[in-house]
Amino acid sequence: MHGLLLAGLLALPMNVLAHPAEHHASNVLSRRGVDIDSFRLPLKAKYMDNEAAAEKIQALSFTKDDDYVSTATKLVKSTFPKSTFRVVDDHYIGTNGIGHVHFKQTAHGLDIDNSDFNVNIDRDGKVFSFGNSFFTGEIPKENPMVKRAFSDPVKALKGAVKALSLPVKSDNAKAKNVAGKETVEFMGTSGALSAPKAKLVYLQKDDGTLALTWRVETDVGENWLLSYVDANNSETVHNVVDYVASAEYKVFAWGLNDPTEGNPTSIRDPWTDASPYTWNSDGNTKYPTTRGNNAIAQDNPTGGSQYLNNYRPQSPNLIFSYPWSATATPPSSYKDFSITQLFYTTNRFHDLLYSFGFNEAAGNFQVNNGNKGGRGNDFAIVNAQDGSGTNNANFATPPDGQPGRMRMYNWTTARPNRDGCLEAGIVIHEYAHGLSNRLCGGPANSACLNALESGGMGEGWGDFYATAIRLKPRDTKNTNYSMGAWAANNPKGIRAYLYSTSLQTNPYMYTSVNSLREVHQIGTVWASMLYELMWALIEAHGNTYSANPVFRNGVPQDGRHLAMKLVMDGMALQPCNPNFVQARDAIIDADRALTNSANKCTIWKAFAKRGLGYGAKYDSRNRTGSNQLPPGC
């Protein structure tokens, strides 16, 4: 099958945008007078890197007959012999040969929802590294299921609606039991995009105790929330997780970052082996429009939740060639071009990430997984010119098996207004939220980047991939990049500092996080470190500037793609809701697994330059910086 796509920003350069660092995110909850950050989950995770894990497991007994799940289970049992837990059904073996197994702690048969254990098993069947946030306090003696010592879930729904000012009408709500212990779906409501749900779970609190809660799930479009409502006092909401990663971007793109960097060109059959059905088929149906196995792209001028019957360009011969002009106005006048561009960028990034290991088993976004593992029926729903907002974009990442949802907005920062779909960097940044949320904590758990610091890293990963993809052959380590300059109509972009290896141009250090209270600010610090890492690896291995990496024994042969691969592998190794130190250690472990630590000192030097060296320590209020290198470097 042949397809001809006319894409305005086709070589895929990348930038990610958000409002200036001094501005706080203005998501829908905050516009309703609710500070979502005040409900974030606390950081609880610990991470045992490869070196520490090797010492820890010497006393443990494993047999050659153990498969990687059994080995991981033995480790959890030996570490917490008095705890009960279950194996989460999302384990898989990554392309680097590391097996990833995830566990959820339980009490009285109920999940402790923020108590997770992840174990990474190497090619030889040995424990490679692990992390956990298991609860170590006293489990309540009484089983709440015996005396039914908890409130009606309808009260919990109403409590969440009231406390968070949700646009959900729940006066006539009724709870209907569905599969799972104390799991319900609410009938008779309106205002949410799908029927709200609730599940009875325990929650670790900051004071070291457990709270019995109803985990109320409400998808209201701009926010897709898990609200932990106290099961005995429905007016108390302990914590909130938001599946939607939102930013005040001012936009981005691949090879070409935005319309200032080139002109639209026609590209024939751009898919790779990552898309065996091509981009316009799911293996069962061939679509003469911007729909396929990986994504479905359409306009959404009303900002509504429906998408299947929305407008898409049609082309029976699969030639998607449409006019565009920088002076055209309004953006709806070139919606065919915009939808095609969004479809192209989303699919192109899907294929690149697949080559790094974000495949079916790892929880990627596809309808048809071709019997390769994971849960299917979850392509990315990507809306162009979405009318639910302006000067923004967001991506909702539910667990594997449910579609991701991207909303791309128009920008009123210039005349004529600009369309965020034409900056691939924004699209890439948003899709990267799907990547990090599916990998961190496992494909079945989308709540592992909701603490302030881990959420900040989620923003930073988006910036990193957007910037790495937009590099040009003329670039050197002295090249600086802004974020969202085109969409923001501001040459300085939307971050507090340019991404730069110069400490004069970008002075952010690890200890800078001590004074930052917003995820995009923290994300800029993390992305600044990853920018250092990328250039350090480019200096060591060169840069092909090719659109696709060249692998040898599974290792990208240039520094830019190697950095992207190691950063992604680190996401799958680190614990649920990691901090900077743990994420750094996971990247170092990723290099050990992939290259036998060939880049260990290069990686350490990059992080140490910005204060995340060997002696750096995490404390939520007083992080300690270090420029030290470990022995041997």
Swiss-Prot record:
GO terms for cellular component: extracellular region. Zn(2+) binds at residues 429, 433. Binds 1 zinc ion per subunit. The keyword Lyase does not apply. GO terms for molecular function: metalloendopeptidase activity; zinc ion binding. Its EC number is 3.4.24.-. Residues 1-18 form the signal peptide. Its cofactor is Zn(2+). Residues 19-246 form a propeptide. The keyword Ribonucleoprotein does not apply. Belongs to the peptidase M36 family. Secreted metalloproteinase that allows assimilation of proteinaceous substrates and probably acts as a virulence factor. This is Extracellular metalloproteinase 3. It comes from Arthroderma gypseum (strain ATCC MYA-4604 / CBS 118893).
